[in-house]
């Protein structure tokens, strides 16, 4: 190695300092993963070289046989990992080994709690990559040269994992990257061939690149010549190309950790080879937990794309719809050309066919998980349910299938847990019920005792309780399931159809006619605040409620639009009253018109509060209520 030139000392990005500190302390109990992370990076470097060499074969520099080599020195207490992949230029070294260029990094770091066990899961999810070397090393040296640059443009990066790192230009004859870990005191166990072999077999057997270690000689062979003999210690074949029957669950799980940069096992996976008009292999995984950036729409998503086993790109998001953005995995096609680009992917009809088939495969996989492992599906729903709810709006062709995977809280369920499927609901419907009833609101606590549910409780009719911010928007696209229409119990003029007897309907009409005078007085008192006043069929215990017009926006949608700064169309509620309630009877008998108006406004404001809405004039409400209390106490 020649003399170093252009040497400079630079500081780590603030987030890197935080991550290094947290990682070294949180991941210490699982320290052997440093090797998996470094091998994974080396594998990616080889993939990138293969891809770039499609257009520029000269990048291979006459060495097309790509491999990873692991060596160690017990006396020097070092472990060295070397690859002959794409390598890095000086600028790339500073960018990749000094900063974290991930969206949502700051948010991620805020979520760390200081609880080592919880933080280790989060950090593992984030993908620690190269920085994991500092779990076992107190100094790391990186020697690298990018393919296509001259031998004089090699780079030496060095750091003790504290606040700064050094970068210098050096001579490096071979392209690729060599990482030298100077092991901390107490970590000498890793400078051992048997230990390194075991870690490679455990975590990286599936890597398609040969991983070589020096051959160890025993007995009489121990005094063999000093020339190193290398032997491959992993299978070195792309896991997805092997027959399913030959792949163990543990191998699938380790491969998932490699492609997803996750520490935890996936919930389930699907490995499938398609032959015929289209030819491709897919290996798709459902993660066990949501990534920290699930709701960052610009966050990387999509599958690893290979064409004829040659890596083409990461995060190919054209193969699955956005509502399945949490799915990880690989797709390897024989039908695409090796020079395929993102622009081509967006226009190729072959991609549309593959997207349709892969989407169906994921939905089938989720159906199977829900049927065979309901407890694991509960974990899936908790992590990804709100994202899956985007499906009916995005994917008309699979709307019914997605609807079958949705889960809700319900008046027949246990608390606020979203565990009721639409099939469960339909299995419990009453004779003559041809609708699926639901109610939306801000929280389970707010809507579980809503006056809108009173008649349903009286008649023993189950109502789904929808409290996620996305729910009202979801229901604007999900209008029916299995031939039965969805009905919002807080919207329009409630008609229970055959669930109301002819006698009930006749009695309702008679009461409405009898209360025409009261209806007119209430309209006069409420004026422009309401669209309509009518006798309610919904109430059994409460005096009044506010219903939403059939075409009007509900509270959830109004709040979403307001939060995003959009203009909210003006709408007025429908005031419904319970004619048999003592307060309404008292109101009907009130001769003093001023007091009638005050009482009416109190009832209106109480109905607004019960619906989860805020009062336009809280001070006027308090004033009227205090006035009433004074009169009652006199």
From Swiss-Prot:
First-listed, main subcellular location of the protein, grouped into a coarse class: cytoplasm
Region feature (A): 1-342
Protein's UniProt keywords contain Heme: no
One Pfam family named in its UniProt record: HSP90
Keyword Manganese attached: no
Subunit structure: Homodimer.
PANTHER family xrefs: HEAT SHOCK PROTEIN 90 FAMILY MEMBER (PTHR11528)
Protein name: Chaperone protein HtpG
Naturally occurring in which organism (per UniProt): Ectopseudomonas mendocina (strain ymp) (Pseudomonas mendocina)
């Amino acid at each position: 190695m020649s003399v170093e030139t252009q040497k400079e000392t630079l500081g780590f990005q603030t987030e890197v300092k935080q991550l290094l500190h947290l990682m070294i302390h949180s991941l210490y109990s699982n320290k052997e993963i440093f090797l998996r992370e470094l091998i994974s990076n080396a594998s990616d470097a080889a993939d990138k070289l293969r891809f770039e060499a499609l257009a520029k074969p000269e990048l291979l520099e006459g060495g097309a046989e790509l491999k990873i080599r692991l060596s160690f020195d017990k006396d020097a207490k070092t472990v060295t990992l070397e690859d002959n992949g794409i390598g890095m230029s000086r600028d790339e070294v500073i960018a990749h080994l000094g900063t974290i260029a991930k969206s949502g990094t700051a948010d991620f770091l805020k979520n760390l709690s200081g609880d080592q066990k919880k933080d280790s899961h989060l950090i593992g999810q984030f993908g620690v990559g190269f920085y994991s070397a500092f779990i076992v090393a107190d100094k790391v040296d990186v020697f690298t040269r990018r393919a296509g640059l001259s031998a004089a443009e090699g780079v030496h990066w060095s750091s003790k994992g504290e606040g700064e790192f050094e970068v210098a230009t050096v001579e490096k004859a071979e392209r690729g990257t060599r990482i030298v870990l100077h092991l901390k005191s107490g970590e000498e166990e890793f400078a051992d061939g048997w230990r390194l072999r075991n870690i490679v077999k455990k975590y990286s057997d599936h890597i398609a690149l040969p991983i070589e270690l020096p051959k160890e000689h025993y007995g009489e062979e121990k005094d063999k010549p000093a020339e190193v003999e290398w032997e491959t210690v992993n299978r070195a074949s792309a896991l997805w190309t092997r027959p399913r029957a030959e792949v163990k669950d543990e191998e699938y799980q380790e491969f998932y950790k490699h492609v997803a940069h996750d520490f935890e096992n996936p919930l389930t996976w699907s490995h499938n080879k398609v032959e015929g008009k289209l030819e491709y292999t897919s290996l798709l995984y459902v993660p066990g937990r949501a990534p920290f950036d699930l709701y960052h729409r610009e966050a990387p998503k999509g599958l690893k794309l290979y064409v004829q086993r040659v890596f083409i790109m990461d995060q190919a998001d054209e193969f699955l719809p956005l509502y399945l953005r949490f799915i990880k995995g690989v797709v390897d096609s024989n039908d695409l050309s090796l020079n395929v680009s993102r622009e081509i992917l967006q226009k190729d009809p072959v991609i549309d066919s593959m997207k349709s088939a892969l989407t169906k495969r994921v939905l089938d996989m989720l159906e199977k998980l829900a049927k065979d492992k309901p407890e694991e599906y509960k974990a899936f729903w908790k992590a990804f349910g709100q994202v899956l709810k985007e499906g009916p709006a995005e994917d008309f062709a699979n709307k019914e299938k997605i609807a079958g995977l949705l889960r809700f809280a319900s008046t027949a369920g246990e608390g606020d847990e979203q565990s009721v499927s639409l099939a469960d609901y339909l299995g419990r419907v009453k004779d003559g019920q041809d609708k699926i009833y639901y109610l939306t609101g801000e929280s389970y606590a707010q809507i579980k005792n809503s006056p809108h549910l009173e008649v349903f409780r009286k008649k023993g009719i189950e109502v789904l309780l929808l409290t996620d911010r996305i729910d009202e928007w979801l229901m604007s696209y999900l209008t029916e399931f299995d031939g039965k229409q969805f009905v919002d119990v807080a919207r329009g003029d409630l008609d229970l159809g055959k669930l109301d007897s002819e006698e009930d309907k006749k009695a309702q009409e008679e009461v409405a006619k009898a209360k025409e005078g009261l209806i007119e007085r209430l309209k006069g008192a409420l004026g422009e605040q309401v669209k309509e006043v009518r006798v309610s069929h919904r109430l059994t215990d409460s005096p009044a409620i506010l219903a939403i017009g059939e075409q009007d926006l509900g509270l959830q949608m109004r709040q979403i639009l307001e939060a995003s700064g959009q203009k909210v169309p003006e709408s007025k509620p429908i005031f419904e009253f319970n004619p048999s309630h003592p307060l309404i009877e008292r109101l009907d008998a009130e001769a003093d018109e001023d007091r009638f108006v005050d009482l009416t406004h109190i009832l209106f404001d109480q109905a607004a509060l019960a619906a989860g809405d805020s009062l336009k004039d809280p001070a006027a409400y308090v004033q009227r209520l205090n006035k009433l209390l004074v009169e009652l106490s006199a």
